[in-house]
């Protein structure tokens, strides 16, 4: 019985790390490679996945943090570091900018702006803090980044050479191909995604 309690205790203490790893895997390995059949819908499908998954991951992290604070455990919260503060300041700036526009659908959803609205920013910020709170090994994060970057780059090189193993560029006009980066999507989405995930580095 004592051994079972010890195992459960260890699992409970590792829950934040597990939740953090799930979020990191989604954001760093799944999102860049995820796309659907409609090429011009690539940003929309990525945004939809982020907005669907992030609230659940945030809830999982909240439950994990509560479960990890077992009786007798005195786990001290780490002081925020520069990227944490910068991300919070950026999020505050986004909220203030949207508030000045009355939180209209154009700024929250941004359906006419490649769906890069406030809701996406909130989800990406939440993902950053979920990963930060889990305190997972930085080497693991770097490995996830490099793995996905290598796959995206490899696909991009193949596409540029006229090889399209995923049928990614079918029916796309030649002049439009240069605005997309492999499976990462349109340059606008790539810039936003890179900015928000840069803090993880």
Describe the predicted segments one by one:
Residues 12, 16-19, 64:
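Generic L/I/V-rich hydrophobic alpha-helical segments across diverse proteins
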Residues 16-24, 80-93, 129-157:
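Interfacial loop-to-transmembrane-helix boundary motif in multi-pass membrane proteins
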Residues 31-56, 76-81, 93-123, 133-136, ...:
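Interfacial transmembrane-helix termini
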Residues 120-127, 146-153, 194-198:
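Membrane-embedded alpha-helical core segments of multi-pass
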